[in-house]
Swiss-Prot record:
One of its GO terms (molecular function) is ribonuclease P activity. Keywords: Endonuclease, Hydrolase, Nuclease, RNA-binding, tRNA processing. The lineage of its organism: Bacteria, Bacillati, Actinomycetota, Actinomycetes, Mycobacteriales. Disulfide bonds: none annotated. It comes from Mycolicibacterium vanbaalenii (strain DSM 7251 / JCM 13017 / BCRC 16820 / KCTC 9966 / NRRL B-24157 / PYR-1). Pfam families: Ribonuclease_P. This is Ribonuclease P protein component. One of its GO terms (biological process) is tRNA 5'-leader removal. InterPro entries: Ribosomal_Su5_D2-typ_SF, Ribsml_uS5_D2-typ_fold_subgr, RNase_P. It catalyses: Endonucleolytic cleavage of RNA, removing 5'-extranucleotides from tRNA precursor.
Length: 119
């Protein structure tokens, strides 16, 4: 489970990250990253978007748990000012955690290359 300080909870944070952030698509997920300019941030924050297109409630919660686990694994690679939103695509319902983690790492690396960010 993601620690509370690393969870994105406000809709304004989600909206800003999705609309102003850099996007990278993978087969199972779309990742958005925005570098926050607030200096008092306790660390990177991660939010999930798992819509009904992914499946019924049981399938959506399963995907959410897997994505949270994958996000926890890459948390240490993120800058403290990073805001990351992970949008699950319908294919993610059949994905296993290692594949989701690899796709998340690949997407974040693509974003780093596009923005020229050091971490």
């Amino acid at each position: 489970m993601l620690p509370a300080q690393h969870r994105m909870t406000r809709s304004t944070e989600f909206g800003a990250t999705v609309s102003k952030g850099t996007r990278a698509a993978q087969p199972d997920v779309v990742v958005y990253r925005l570098r926050s300019d607030q200096t008092a941030d306790p660390g990177p924050r991660v939010g999930l978007i798992v819509s009904k297109a992914v499946g019924n409630a049981v399938q959506r919660h399963r995907v959410s748990r897997r994505l949270r686990h994958a996000a926890l694994a890459v948390l240490e690679d993120l800058d403290p000012s990073d805001r990351v939103v992970i949008r699950a695509l319908p294919r993610s319902r059949d994905a296993v955690t290692p594949r989701l983690e690899q796709e998340l790492r690949t997407a974040l690396e693509r974003i780093r290359q596009r923005t020229g960010a050091p971490s």
